[in-house]
């Protein structure tokens, strides 16, 4: 399928979305922009768009092999990918295998505390509101999703967790937590957006070194080098 990039549909914090001549498909452009704190801090980090695009393509293909439908169609270039056009559900699904980030702040937990079984949370995707936590009841009452869609999203999120925990563990890494976004394509719930170190927490199993966007949030340095290390350790082809 050879589709050409047309009008800019949407520019997010780190990706731009373009129309194609086929209304069922879009082109995502992964930019070098890196943001934190709901877009309050934005910087350019060289190679980031390429690294995240390749990382995401690898993960999406692994998930497809496990029977999880995603919007990924094919990688077009170093920083662009062809995807199905989804009707996005404005709710982020977050799984936590270990305590970190906002959960530590909210409940006073020790960072790195194992969570068994993993926790599952929903957040309304709205930067202006700070992506507040919501629940299934609110999501249904406000018309964001049906109970059946929410149940499928939860099922798929835990399936993703099972697949990726094993993948990262084999690379000597801890998948601490991650967020997913879903949409509807031809009446099916499909995984959308991206999976990269921008949207998850990944630590070295032995040293607990952070290898994700917390390096940017916490000004730890070596952000892209850490992304590339994770990619290398799980087998992402970077050339």
Swiss-Prot record:
The keyword Ligase belongs to this UniProt entry's keyword annotation: yes
Family annotation (HAMAP family): SAICAR_synth
EC number of the protein: 6.3.2.6
Name this protein carries in UniProt: Phosphoribosylaminoimidazole-succinocarboxamide synthase
Keywords linked to the UniProt accession: ATP-binding, Ligase, Nucleotide-binding, Purine biosynthesis
BP GO terms, sorted: 'de novo' IMP biosynthetic process; cobalamin biosynthetic process
Alphabetical list of SUPFAM superfamilies matching this protein: SAICAR synthase-like (SSF56104)
GO molecular function: ATP binding; phosphoribosylaminoimidazolesuccinocarboxamide synthase activity
């Amino acid at each position: 399928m050879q589709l050409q990039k047309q009008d800019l549909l949407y520019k997010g914090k780190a990706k731009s979305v373009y129309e194609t001549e086929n209304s069922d498909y879009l082109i995502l452009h992964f930019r070098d922009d890196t943001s934190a704190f709901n877009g309050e801090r934005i910087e350019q980090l060289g190679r980031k768009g390429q690294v995240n695009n390749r990382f995401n393509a690898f993960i999406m293909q692994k998930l497809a092999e496990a029977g999880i439908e995603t919007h990924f169609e094919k990688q077009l270039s170093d920083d662009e990918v062809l995807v199905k056009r989804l009707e996005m559900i404005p709710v982020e699904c977050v799984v936590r295998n270990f305590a970190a980030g906002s959960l530590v702040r909210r409940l006073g937990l020790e960072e790195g505390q194992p969570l068994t079984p993993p926790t599952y949370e929903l957040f309304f995707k709205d930067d202006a509101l700070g992506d507040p936590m919501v629940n299934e009841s609110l999501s249904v009452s406000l018309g964001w999703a049906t109970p059946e869609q929410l149940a499928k999203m939860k099922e798929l999120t835990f399936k993703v967790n099972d697949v990726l925990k094993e993948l990262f563990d084999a690379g000597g890494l801890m998948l601490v937590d991650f967020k997913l976004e879903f949409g509807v394509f031809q009446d099916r719930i499909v995984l959308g957006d991206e999976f990269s170190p921008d949207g998850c927490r990944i630590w070295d199993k032995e040293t607990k070194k952070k290898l994700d966007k917390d390096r940017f949030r916490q000004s730890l340095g070596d952000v892209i080098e850490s992304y590339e290390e994770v990619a290398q350790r799980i087998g992402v082809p970077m050339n």
